[in-house]
C-alpha cells in the first residue's frame, strides 16, 4: 500500500481506510466493554466476558449498512489479522515474563496429568462425532487436518482468558488459581506443538524451518540475557531502563515473531519461551514488567477479547446448522468436564475444586482462532459455514464457561477464600507467603535480612516453598491526592508531574539494589509492590493487599529506628498509629520488626557468619504463632535457634521426654518439662510436638527458665540481651504471672509487655526484636487511638 494512502483513500467519499476504522473499532470495544463490565462486575463476572460481549454488540451493529461499510472495508481482514498478531505477541511475551515458575515446577505432575486427561477424553468423545460431522458438512478431503483443527480448536483452553479471569476474581495468588493458569498454559502449548508437528509432516518443508527458528530463538534468549545484565550498567543511577532500551527488546521479539509467521508457522510458542527464559531479577526485568503490564492488561487484552466477539457471526448458518452447533458446544464442555474430573480424581485434588477447574479450562478463543486463520492452503474444507460455526462455538463456550464459573465462585465463596491466615497449623513443606512493608532503604535492609532468614538457605538441601513480597510504602502528600494516576508515579524523576524525590521513592534505587543482591545470592525472587496512599488510609490498603496476595503474615517496621550512635529516634507517631490500625484490621498474622541493624540482626546472604536467634515462649496463641514462624528458621544453616521457655516457679511439672539429642553448633541446655495439667493444654501439646520434631533432632536448642514474677523475667532478659542478635516473641499472653508488673512502665502497647521491654532504648538489649500477633477477629488490648 502507498504510504500516502495509509490513512486516507483517494476517493472523495471515503474519508477513512481500514487502519483508521480499526482504531475506532478498538475505541468502541473499550467503551462498550467498560459499560458491560460496570453492570456485570457486581454479579461476579470477569472482564473477558464483558469484552467479548462488547465485540458481539459491535458485530451485530454491522447489520446496519453504513456501519458495515465503515468497519468492513476492502483489505480490513488483513489489517485485523496483522494487528491481532501484534497484540498476541505482546501479551504472550508478558505471560512468559509473569508466570510463576516455582509453582509450575512444584505442580508439574498435576498440570501434565490434567492436560493429558483433558485432551485424551476430548479426543475420544470427538472421534464418533467427527464421522457424523464430515458427512453433515460434506467434507471431501483433508480429513486429517479437519480433525486436527477441530480437536485442537474445541479441546483447547485459551490461556489469556484464563489468566485475565483469574486475576479479576483475585485468585491469581491462590493455589487453585495458579493451578488453573498452569493447566491452561500446558494445554495451549501442547496443542500448538501437536499442530505444528503434524503440519510440518504434511507439508514436508517446515521441519527444517522449525529447527532453524528454534536455534534463532535460542540466540534471542542468550542475547536477552546479555542485554539484561549489560544495559543496567550503562546508567546505574537510574531506577529503570530508558524507553529506547526497552524498545530494543520489543523489536528483537517482533523480528523473530514476524520471521516465523512469514514461514506459515505459529510464533506463539517461540515468543512464550523467550519470555519464560528471560532473567527474572534486576533492573531490566522490573522495567519490562512496569512498562508492559499496565497497557497490556488494560488495553491490549480487552481489545483482543473484543475482537473475538466481533468475529461472531451466524449469517451463513441455517436452522440445521444450529443443531450441530449445539451438539458441538455440549460435547466440547462434556469432554473437558470428564477429562478434568478424571484427572482431579487421580491426583486427589479436593472435590470442591473439580467443577471450577473443568469450567475454567473450557474457555476458548486464542489459539483456536489463530489456527483457524492460518495455513489455508492445507484446508480444502474451509468454507464460510465452517468458519462461522467454529467461531460461534468458541464464543458461546467461552461465555458459558465464564458465567458458570463465576456463579460457582459466588455459591462456594468460602471454599476459595484465603484460609491460611496464621502459621500454627502450617508445615514447612507448604508454601509460606509473607509481605514485608518498608518506607525506605533503612527498613528494606532489615526486612531483607528477615526474608533471608526465613528463606531456609542450607547448602545441599531443598528449600521450602517461599514467596516473599516487599511493599514500598509511600505516603502521598495531600496536594497530590487527585492529580496523578498510579502508573504515572513510576515515570522518570524528570517527570513534570512529580518524580521519585517528591513521592518518597528517591531511595527506590537502593531498595532495588538490595533486593537484586539477595536474589542473586539466594535465587529467590522477591516480588515488589509499590503502595502510594495518604497516610490516614494506608492501613486499609495494606490490609487489602494481605488478602489479595494471600499472605500468612505481614511484617511492619517499628516507628523508631536506631541511629549510628546506637540511640533510638522516633520517626513519627503517624507511623505508630498506622501499625496499630493494621494490628486491629489485618486478616492475617502480623509481625512488628524492631530493627537494630547496627548491633542486632544483620543480612545473612553474602556472608558465612552464623547468627543466634532466641524464641521466647511464655504461652498463649501469639507465642505459639511466633514459635511457628521460627520453624522456617530451622532450615537455615546460618541461623542457630534457641527456644527459651519461661515457666512459673510455682507450677507443678513432670518429665515427659528423655534427654535431648544435639548436633554440632546446636546445644540443648535442659530437658523439656511439660506444664501441669492445670496449664493450657494447647500450649503443652504444641510445645511437645515442636520439641520432638526439632529439638530431639538437634536442629534447635532449648532452655527452660523458672520465674515467679515480672521482675525475675526482666532480670533474665537483661542477662541474655547480649547473647542473641534477634528475639522472636508473641505480643499478648493474657494474665500471665511471669510478666506481672512489667506493664507498669510500658511505652508501646502494640509490642506487648515483653516486646516493649526488649525494644526499649533504656534497657541493655542490643538485639533486633520481632513481635508476632496471631490473626484473630477480636481485640481487647489496645489503647484508644
UniProtKB/Swiss-Prot annotation:
GO terms for CC? Answer: membrane
* Claim: rRNA-binding is one of the keywords in the record: no
Q: Where in the cell is it found?
A: Membrane
Query: Can you name one GO molecular function term for this protein?
Result: antiporter activity
Keywords for this protein: Antiport, Ion transport, Membrane, Potassium, Potassium transport, Transmembrane, Transmembrane helix, Transport
This protein's record includes keyword Amino-acid biosynthesis: no
Principal localisation: membrane
BP terms from Gene Ontology: potassium ion transport; proton transmembrane transport
Annotated membrane topology is: Multi-pass membrane protein
Indicate the transmembrane segments per the record: 19-39, 44-64, 79-99, 112-132, 143-163, 179-199, 201-221, 240-260, 294-314, 323-343, 352-372, 389-409
Expression sites by tissue: Specifically expressed in pollen.
PANTHER family in the record, alphabetically?
CATION/H + ANTIPORTER, CATION_H(+) ANTIPORTER 1
Q: Which family does it belong to?
A: Belongs to the monovalent cation:proton antiporter 2 (CPA2) transporter (TC 2.A.37) family. CHX (TC 2.A.37.4) subfamily.
What's its job? May operate as a cation/H(+) antiporter.
What is the name of this protein?
A: Cation/H(+) antiporter 1
**Could you tell me the gene encoding this protein?**
CHX1
